[in-house]
UniProtKB/Swiss-Prot annotation:
Gene name of the record: mraY
Subcellular location as annotated: Cell membrane
Record's function text: Catalyzes the initial step of the lipid cycle reactions in the biosynthesis of the cell wall peptidoglycan: transfers peptidoglycan precursor phospho-MurNAc-pentapeptide from UDP-MurNAc-pentapeptide onto the lipid carrier undecaprenyl phosphate, yielding undecaprenyl-pyrophosphoryl-MurNAc-pentapeptide, known as lipid I.
Full protein name: Phospho-N-acetylmuramoyl-pentapeptide-transferase
Organism placement in taxonomy: Bacteria, Bacillati, Bacillota, Bacilli, Bacillales
Native source species: Shouchella clausii (strain KSM-K16) (Alkalihalobacillus clausii)
NCBIfam families recorded: mraY
Catalysed reactions, semicolon-separated: UDP-N-acetyl-alpha-D-muramoyl-L-alanyl-gamma-D-glutamyl-meso-2,6-diaminopimeloyl-D-alanyl-D-alanine + di-trans,octa-cis-undecaprenyl phosphate = di-trans,octa-cis-undecaprenyl diphospho-N-acetyl-alpha-D-muramoyl-L-alanyl-D-glutamyl-meso-2,6-diaminopimeloyl-D-alanyl-D-alanine + UMP
Keyword Membrane listed: yes
InterPro entries: Glycosyl_transferase_4 (IPR000715), PNAcMuramoyl-5peptid_Trfase (IPR003524), PNAcMuramoyl-5peptid_Trfase_CS (IPR018480)
GO biological process, alphabetically ordered: cell division; cell wall organization; peptidoglycan biosynthetic process; regulation of cell shape
Gene Ontology cellular component terms for the protein in this record: plasma membrane
Pathway: Cell wall biogenesis; peptidoglycan biosynthesis
Topology term for the membrane: Multi-pass membrane protein
Membrane-spanning intervals of the chain: 7-27, 57-77, 81-101, 122-142, 146-166, 186-206, 227-247, 252-272, 302-322
């Protein structure tokens, strides 16, 4: 498979997002699908209230346009490609329902945590059944080494934890203009390189499609954002990156490449644990990006800094996965 196919998929998904976004944004405004802003959030965010949300639909559509091109013209519809499409669409649907309820209720509360968890578990179960059907092994490799271990039936628990953890971690990161679109494109770009070097061609192409879709969406999501991706986009991306890590047998690499998402999640865990145990908060606000806003950083400065940190994690992951393995 020639490298030009990666460029073709990248350009196709980027173009799809760039073309569809300006058509979709007025449609969202007409339907009054505006974002509700939490009252307890940073005061500077109140002016964003009403900004069109559910832009993740554009991201998912752009990914699927490219995925269809991959399936029809490049690799065929392999089981791995179909599983990636199912997980991305499934988590995107859960996010869509959540976003829709928020818009209809005019409040930043959509699905309950139990309802969202149930939806995520159903998709995880479907994914696991799909893995069993293709004879997927349960061996875990330690990045950068020749060591590993077989989890056996415990692999099911790992899959559930990865899909739930990644989807929620990515969702937490979507709090500033361009933050998730930028860090996400970096992480998926890294996985595209890792998958390609490991011979997982269809997964590499799918990762590239997501990278292109996010870069195209970033044109309209960068500060000041004209549209937000909402849970439709963030949950789809979280599910996708976990599925990619699993299918490429780079489960532990997700912690490195997705380092920004891990840090954001840890900041929330630390904040909640500290407040419950001591009654004091470690950060001004969590997730971490809000803390930096409240200490005086501009939104754009926070976003660019997180992009740079994401690049460092991505470079580390590619170095370990390609050159040390």
């Amino acid at each position: 498979m020639e490298e030009w196919t990666l460029l073709f998929v990248l350009i196709l998904s980027f173009a799809a997002a760039v073309i569809m976004s300006p058509l979709f944004i007025p449609f969202l405004r007409k339907l009054k699908f505006g974002q509700s802003i939490r009252e307890e959030g940073p005061k500077s965010h109140q002016k964003k209230s009403g900004t069109p949300t559910m832009g993740g639909i554009v991201i998912v559509l752009s990914i699927f346009i490219s995925a269809l091109a991959i399936g029809i013209a490049i690799t065929g519809f392999t089981p791995e490609l179909l599983l990636l499409m199912v997980v991305t669409l499934g988590y995107g649907i859960v996010g869509f329902v959540d976003d829709y309820l928020k818009v209809v209720r005019k409040h930043n509360l959509g699905l309950t945590s139990k309802q969202k968890l149930a939806g995520q578990l159903v998709i995880a179960a479907i994914f696991y059944i799909g893995l069993l059907a293709i004879g997927f092994d349960t061996f875990i490799a330690i990045p950068g080494t020749t060591f590993g271990f077989d989890l056996g039936w415990l692999y099911l628990i790992l899959i559930v934890l990865m899909l739930l953890g990644a989807s929620n971690a990515v969702n937490l990161t979507d709090g500033l203009d361009g933050l998730l679109a930028g860090t996400g494109s970096i992480a998926f770009g890294a996985f595209a390189i890792l998958a390609w070097s490991g011979g997982f061609i269809d997964t590499a192409l799918f990762s590239t499609a997501i990278t292109g879709a996010l870069l195209g969406f970033l044109v309209f999501n960068a500060h000041p954002a004209k549209v937000f991706m909402g849970d439709t986009g963030s949950l789809a991306l979280g599910g996708a990156i976990a599925a990619i890590a699993i299918l490429t047998k780079m489960e532990l690499m997700l912690i490195i490449v997705g380092g920004v998402f891990v840090i954001e999640t840890l900041s929330v865990i630390i904040q909640v644990a500290s407040f419950k145990l001591t009654g004091k908060r470690v950060f001004r606000m969590s997730p971490l990006h809000h803390h930096y806003e409240l200490v005086g950083w501009s939104e754009w400065r926070v976003v660019v800094t997180f992009w740079l940190v994401g690049m460092i994690f991505a470079i580390m992951g590619v170095y370990i996965g390609v050159w040390l393995t």
